[in-house]
């Protein structure tokens, strides 16, 4: 991935990459493979992307692989949900609108910090949070629902009520459908731990030592503010009608909807 997020789990050795993380493997025939798969599907479903590598890295502007895949999804009448940190997804809002008119399209956007200067440090090659917020608003204005991921919250850095409230305000103003948050903290494994600590040494003096003292070699680094902040997120979501809870939001993301079937049902009524 080209985003350079200092906390990225995909750097972990468990994924057995045999090249530099910053070197991009391009699946040039992605749209052809997708089309062949969709042709064989007996039932329509939701197609998702963005779990391991962002579909809107800077290289996508040139390659247009994601756009070609969206065109295939639209052609065959499937639904789609993409997870990204990039405002570049705006380029394809026309296709998301077409897909959503016939079935269901959902934008998933990750937000980590309401502090733009901090955002540029921990996510150096990504659209800043304000740009992501504007993207969420634009999708809502075009009738396309969105889900926001709150992840990760780095202990002693962005695991504060002030930050959470700033992100929640963005979500309320953008009228997001749901929020996913597994907890306040992050995970570190062999491979990404070393890179993360090297970035802490560069940008946050003495922070690595604080992490090692507090968490040792743990995989799960849970913030001491976890319960307080998770309750805060839950309370605000409940008060503003925002879906919250991993099971509920995932169920919504996975559920395929056909506008044509809905219309025919109403026609019969």
Regions found by a protein language model. Give the residues of each.
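Alpha-helix-loop-beta-strand connector modules within alpha/beta enzyme cores
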Residues: 71, 133-142, 225-231, 235-237
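A structural motif
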Residues: 77-78, 144, 176
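Auxiliary Fe-S-binding modules of radical SAM enzymes
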Residues: 162-269
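Acidic-and-aromatic substrate-binding clefts and catalytic sites of carbohydrate-active enzymes
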Residues: 26, 88-90, 155-158, 187
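Conserved strand-turn element in the central/C-terminal portion of the radical SAM core barrel
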Residues: 114-116, 123-125, 138-160, 183-186
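Short, electropositive alpha-helical surface patch
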Residues: 63-64, 97-109, 158-175, 200-203
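Conserved Radical SAM active-site core
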Residues: 2-108, 112-120, 129-133, 138
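Alpha-helix N-cap and loop-to-helix initiation/capping positions
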Residues: 22-26, 61, 123-131, 159-163, ...
């Amino acid at each position: 991935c080209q985003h350079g997020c200092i906390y990225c789990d995909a750097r972990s050795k468990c994924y057995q990459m045999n090249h530099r993380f910053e070197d991009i493997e391009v699946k040039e025939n992605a749209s052809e493979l997708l089309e062949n798969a969709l042709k064989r599907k007996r039932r329509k479903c939701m197609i998702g992307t963005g779990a391991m590598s962002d579909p809107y890295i800077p290289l996508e502007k040139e390659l247009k692989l994601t756009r070609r895949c969206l065109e295939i999804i639209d052609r065959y009448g499937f639904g789609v949900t993409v997870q990204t940190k990039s405002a570049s997804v705006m380029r394809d809002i026309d296709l998301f609108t077409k897909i959503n008119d016939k079935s269901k399209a959902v934008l998933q956007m990750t937000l980590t910090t309401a502090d733009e200067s901090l955002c540029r440090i921990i996510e150096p090659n990504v659209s800043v949070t304000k740009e992501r917020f504007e993207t969420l608003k634009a999708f809502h204005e075009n009738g396309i629902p969105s889900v926001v991921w709150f992840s990760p919250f780095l202990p002693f850095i962005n695991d504060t009520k002030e930050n959470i409230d700033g992100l929640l305000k963005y979500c309320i103003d953008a009228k997001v459908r749901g929020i996913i948050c597994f907890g306040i903290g992050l995970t570190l494994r062999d491979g990404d731990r070393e890179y993360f600590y090297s970035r802490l040494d560069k940008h946050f003096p003495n922070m690595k030592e604080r992490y090692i003292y507090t968490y040792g070699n743990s995989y799960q680094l849970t913030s001491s503010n976890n319960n307080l902040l998770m309750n805060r997120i839950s309370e605000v979501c409940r008060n503003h009608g925002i879906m919250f809870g991993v099971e509920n939001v995932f169920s919504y993301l996975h559920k395929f909807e056909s506008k044509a079937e809905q219309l025919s049902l109403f026609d019969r009524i």
